[in-house]
Amino acid sequence: FEPDWIIGMGGGSPIDAAKAMWAFYEYPEVTFEDLIIPFNFPKLRTKARFCAIPSTSGTATEVTAFSVITDYEKGIKYPLADFNITPDVAIVDPKLAETMPPKLTAFTGMDAMTHAVEAYVSTMNCDYTDPLALHAIKMVHEDLEDSYDGDMEARARMHNAQCLAGMAFSNALLGIVHSMAHKTGAAYSGGHIVHGCANAMYLPKVIKFNAKDPVAASRYADIARFIGL
């Protein structure tokens, strides 16, 4: 069995796991400890390419250079980071997100919002990431509540919004909200705090803290004006 394509389908966790499996398939001798060193992946695509098909509207792992693997026994989330693991093909079909229950819709939506906000305020933002981040923020602001209430047109726009946010943060990177969410996400509540819920808890506090910096405050003000606050 030597597949030349690997397909990861589902929410962020299954697709992220498939990204790691892809590396082990191509390089069986590689250890997980090798992969957790940032931007230290071996060259992939020697055996297979990767297609990601998301069925939730939050992580945007289908367009990013990141994967998060959780060790529940140790209570640790390991972020894997390397442009090698950016999928070759992403199939972003909103129909696949229509069966998300309300809580999952809320949590993944706040993950997408946090991706976009952190990308826009990132010190690595640029003219290419800003439009993606701002438009994603506007879409989530307008559509998340309706998506939660079962509006499938809003659900479809949320699926696209999270992908835009992913393209933004995969290039501009993220901030301390995600740092804390990853560190605490696997450490409490019997081993897990839902990632989007952790982001939602930390984002207001981090905005207040970051806004002490004039440049960050100006970027947050841009966001507020753009969405009509």
Placement of each model-derived feature along the sequence:
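Glycine/threonine-rich beta-strand-loop-alpha-helix active-site module
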Residues: 3-95
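Gly/Pro-rich interdomain helix-loop hinge
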Residues: 186-229
